[in-house]
């Protein structure tokens, strides 16, 4: 994880740790001139590691985004941001996306009153995300919500009721609220040159 954030910069979905300010400069000095391929590859890796996807999963999302109407890069980011594991992370119900994935896999999370144990479940507007009514489930979420730093930093497509451990998806995410600094066009370019 630390090698990844040193090389690619902050990846809030993977870890809350930040790269040291000097390490960025060292990487640039060590690497010399970066090729266009390397720049595209690093953007793709940043996206992959932030959302915790395998190469095959990311490729599948790129294909889905390519078939949809509109900007492929923007649609790709929307698809990734609307995954259940990412929504839990953005609501502050988990400290990282792998942590959110574990909550989902262990069946602690309900969507519209039904248990969903698939982290890649695509949330839709008006979905209500809650925890199971068990003490253990609530305790796990309570720890994260209590330590979540700024409720006012919540993206505008989400609302949370921290006392009822309930989150609401208001709408599809707007691109300015994406939680990662990334040039998504470079990711799309990377895959378009692979085929």
From Swiss-Prot:
InterPro entries reported for this sequence: Ribosomal_uS4, Ribosomal_uS4_bac-type, Ribosomal_uS4_CS, Ribosomal_uS4_N, S4_RNA-bd, S4_RNA-bd_sf
Entry keyword set: Chloroplast, Plastid, Ribonucleoprotein, Ribosomal protein, RNA-binding, rRNA-binding
Location in the cell: Plastid, Chloroplast
Record domain S4 RNA-binding: where: 82-143
Gene Ontology annotations for the cellular component aspect, listed alphabetically: chloroplast; small ribosomal subunit
GO biological process: ribosomal small subunit biogenesis; translation
Molecular function GO terms recorded: rRNA binding; structural constituent of ribosome
NCBIfam families xref list: PRK05327.1, rpsD_bact
Family of this protein: Belongs to the universal ribosomal protein uS4 family.
Subunit and interaction comment: Part of the 30S ribosomal subunit. Contacts protein S5. The interaction surface between S4 and S5 is involved in control of translational fidelity.
Function: One of the primary rRNA binding proteins, it binds directly to 16S rRNA where it nucleates assembly of the body of the 30S subunit. With S5 and S12 plays an important role in translational accuracy.
This protein's name: Small ribosomal subunit protein uS4c
Organism of provenance: Pillansia templemannii
Gene label: rps4
């Amino acid at each position: 994880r630390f090698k990844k954030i040193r090389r690619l910069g902050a990846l809030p979905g993977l870890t809350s740790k930040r790269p040291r300010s000097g390490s960025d400069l060292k990487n640039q000095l060590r690497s010399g001139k970066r090729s266009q391929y390397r720049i595209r590859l690093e953007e793709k890796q940043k996206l992959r590691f932030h959302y915790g996807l395998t190469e095959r999963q990311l490729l599948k999302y790129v294909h889905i985004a390519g078939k949809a109407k509109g900007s492929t890069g923007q649609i790709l980011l929307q698809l990734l941001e609307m995954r259940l594991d990412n929504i839990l992370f953005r609501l502050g119900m988990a400290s990282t996306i792998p942590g959110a994935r574990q909550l989902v896999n262990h069946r602690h999370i309900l969507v519209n009153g039904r248990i969903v144990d698939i982290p890649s479940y695509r949330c839709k507007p008006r979905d209500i995300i809650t925890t199971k009514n068990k003490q253990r489930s609530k305790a796990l979420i309570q720890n994260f919500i209590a330590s979540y730093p700024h409720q006012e930093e919540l993206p505008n497509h989400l609302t949370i009721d921290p006392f009822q451990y309930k989150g609401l998806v208001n709408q599809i995410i707007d691109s300015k609220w994406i939680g990662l600094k990334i040039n998504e066009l470079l990711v799309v370019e990377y895959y378009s040159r692979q085929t």
